[in-house]
Amino acid sequence: MIVRHLSLGDFRNYTRADVALLPGATLFVGSNGQGKTNLVEALGFLSTLGSHRVSTDQALVRQGAESAVIRALLQHAGRELRVEVQINRSAANRAQVNGTATKTRELPRYFSSVLFAPEDLALVRGDPSGRRRLLDQLLVLRTPRLAGVLSDYDRALKQRNTLLKSARARGMKADQLSTLDIWDERLVAIGSQIIAARGALVESLQPELARAYLAVAGSDHGPSARPELSILADDPGEDDVADETGARDGGRFTRTEDVVPVFTAAIARMRPRELERGLTLVGPHRDDVLFRLNGLPAKGYASHGESWSFALAIKLASAELLRRDSQTGDPVLILDDVFAELDQARRGRLAEAVTGFEQVLITAAVFEDVPEHLAANAVHIRAGAIVESPTPASASEPASPGEDGGAA
């Protein structure tokens, strides 16, 4: 799959922007703060329903506007598809596919992308929340129905936490809360699906991770990934950090029916502590995935270069998995200011690894940071305007310049 045309309205610093895109590699180049990342951020939003830079959608709406619009013309095997999302500042977002309204959470069914960014280093060195988000985004791209499961879990968790906080405030004991039993069952039923799906995903990623790491690093350091489950811990810590001893090793849980009894027992075991804290202490919202190199946790032991290689390998492995499973072609690869973070050797190896994908979109502040064969088609961005872009004769819509709406 490729993006033939991207159109933005009141998105970030663009009042309006239109750009026609080519198969293969396209480089968006411009000084920092000009708006080049905003273009690829918009495409990332279409496939993940979120931004890699901010946690709230409101930040994506141009200052002074009430909504932003992202439109993309997609093409696969000669067929075209138009997808659109309207991001509203004070109302629910809205989506369309070929002019027909659809649920926003259905968009990943039609378009998938994998984004590489400087923030990816936090996948190795950062908190568990980033690794959970990585897995969940990939789950939804592979199996779009899981977007509903994840939303249902968030709602059940919120309701259960509200009940626990109320019980703590009123000094109620565990045997006085029959309503909590209902929410326990719901949390276990939904959460077990997520735990099993993540476990199966990590298992599928493992061989791709090994190949991708070798391709990027040029050496085999035995990269591995293993789920770490809070339902297996006797005493989940407040810092939400995986147990490096393996006490929380959840690699064997890839089926929902295997997770349910263990989750049920953990909920019962932790109820007294949860009533003390007013908080749900076990479940997929407290889990992690442990990355290892040469048998040691990458977090805390891997060098800066090894950490970067692992982060890039995780994203490449994700892309290969989507490519293998997809019936709509390759995911679009988005490399946002990544080459500036890498040494010359890793730049070359990463460029070689992504060259075979149908479409690769790259941003860079310095033209020379990008290997030459990836920079042939360049889109120049200046002050929130597209000042130069490729104009393929086969493009279905003309490109027109964006307008300056403020730096971003």
Curated annotation (Swiss-Prot):
Question: Which positions does UniProt annotate for ATP binding?
Answer: G30, S31, N32, G33, Q34, G35, K36, T37
Q: Does the keyword Cytoplasm apply?
A: yes
Record-level GO BP terms: DNA replication; DNA synthesis involved in DNA repair; double-strand break repair; SOS response
Which is one GO molecular function term here?
ATP binding
Chain segments carrying region Disordered: 220-252, 389-408
Q: Which UniProt keywords apply?
A: ATP-binding, Cytoplasm, DNA damage, DNA repair, DNA replication, DNA-binding, Nucleotide-binding, SOS response
Q: Which PROSITE patterns has this protein been placed in?
A: RECF_2
Give residue spans, biased composition: Low complexity: 389-402
Protein localization = Cytoplasm
A single GO cellular-component term on record: cytoplasm
Q: Which family does it belong to?
A: Belongs to the RecF family.
Q: Which HAMAP family match?
A: RecF
Q: What does this protein do, in the record's words?
A: The RecF protein is involved in DNA metabolism; it is required for DNA replication and normal SOS inducibility. RecF binds preferentially to single-stranded, linear DNA. It also seems to bind ATP.
* Stored NCBIfam families: recf
Stated name of the protein = DNA replication and repair protein RecF
Which species is this record about? Clavibacter sepedonicus (Clavibacter michiganensis subsp. sepedonicus)
